[in-house]
């Protein structure tokens, strides 16, 4: 009788252990599924969509050239203003939009012309913009973005003015070539970006697409300050050259140079920009930076 009870006890113990193991497996599987459903899990627990420290080397810049950046209580970008000689634009960020077709909504208002538009941004698993609907009145333009394994933007397709495709080529973490092609008028622009013999590390994560990298980002440029357009280049650009070609065979070449002033941490304080078109005099401007430290 005692032997039978011992045998029953052992069998019961085995059954209980099996159940515990199965429950542990289920818990682990559920945890993994939860991890897959998050934008970032395990590798960077501090990742927050809209937080500029995702790209700006753990700083929250206040001023980057003609852009001023403002933050909410969670450290996310809430407002970006762009001001130049033509006026100001304001971009407002909503990370919990009522719209069900996007993860982030950016509302942009242009003060001088009383124009308003909305960017409905859908993110990929890394928290970068993948699909965007740009809505202005009854018009909808589409954007699509692709990134390399390092999280850097390599392709942009936009429907504005016909299908416009921008292809970006990198060398050692830096944008080396940009080709923009439009199916609407068969025009194209081919640009090369140089980083000089003495390269300057891009410690601030500066990526001024239109101004320095020959990428026609337009309204989507605001999204970069919230970390929504991928990782920055490894170094700061020191010059670029763009050759634009029309369907009629007309070509125009543009040159730009960038002279950087750095602080003790090797972050930009200012940059002197000189631009030259063929057979024209040069124009210059100075951009300043405030890293909010």
Language model segments and positions:
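Bacterial N-terminal signal peptides that target proteins for export
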Residues: 18-27
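Buried hydrophobic residues that stabilize the cores of well-folded domains
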Residues: 43-293
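A general structural-boundary detector
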Residues: 28-29, 253
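Hydrophobic helical h-region of N-terminal Sec-dependent signal peptides
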Residues: 29-35
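C-terminal motif of bacterial Sec signal peptides marking the signal peptidase cleavage site
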Residues: 36-40
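Short, Lys/Arg-enriched N-terminal segments with co-localized hydrophobic residues
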Residues: 1-17
């Amino acid at each position: 009788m005692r032997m039978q009870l011992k045998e029953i006890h052992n069998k019961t113990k085995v059954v209980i252990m099996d159940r515990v193991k199965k429950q542990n497996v289920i818990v682990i599987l559920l945890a993994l599924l939860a991890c897959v459903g998050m934008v970032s899990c395990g590798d960077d627990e501090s990742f927050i969509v809209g937080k500029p420290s995702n790209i700006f080397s753990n700083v929250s810049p206040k001023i980057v050239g003609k852009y001023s950046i403002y933050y909410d209580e969670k450290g996310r970008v809430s407002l970006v203003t762009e001001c130049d000689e033509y006026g100001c634009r304001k971009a407002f960020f909503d990370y919990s939009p009522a719209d069900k077709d996007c993860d982030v909504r950016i509302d942009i208002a242009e003060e001088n012309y009383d124009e308003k538009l909305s960017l409905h941004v859908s993110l990929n698993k890394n928290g970068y913009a993948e699909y965007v609907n740009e809505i202005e009145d009854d018009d909808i333009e589409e954007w699509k973005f692709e990134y390399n394994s390092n999280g850097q933007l390599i392709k942009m397709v936009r429907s504005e003015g016909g299908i416009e495709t921008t292809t970006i080529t990198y060398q050692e973490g830096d944008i080396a070539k940009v080709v923009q092609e439009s199916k609407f008028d068969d025009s194209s622009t081919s640009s090369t970006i140089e980083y000089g013999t003495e390269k300057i590390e891009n410690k601030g994560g500066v990526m001024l697409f239109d101004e320095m990298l020959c990428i026609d980002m337009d309204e989507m440029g605001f999204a970069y300050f919230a970390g929504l357009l991928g990782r920055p280049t490894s170094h700061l650009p020191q010059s670029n050259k763009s050759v634009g070609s029309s369907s009629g065979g007309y070509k125009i070449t543009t040159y730009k140079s960038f002279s950087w002033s750095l602080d003790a941490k090797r972050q930009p304080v200012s940059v002197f920009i000189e631009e030259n078109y063929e057979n024209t005099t040069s124009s210059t401007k100075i951009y300043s930076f405030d890293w909010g430290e």
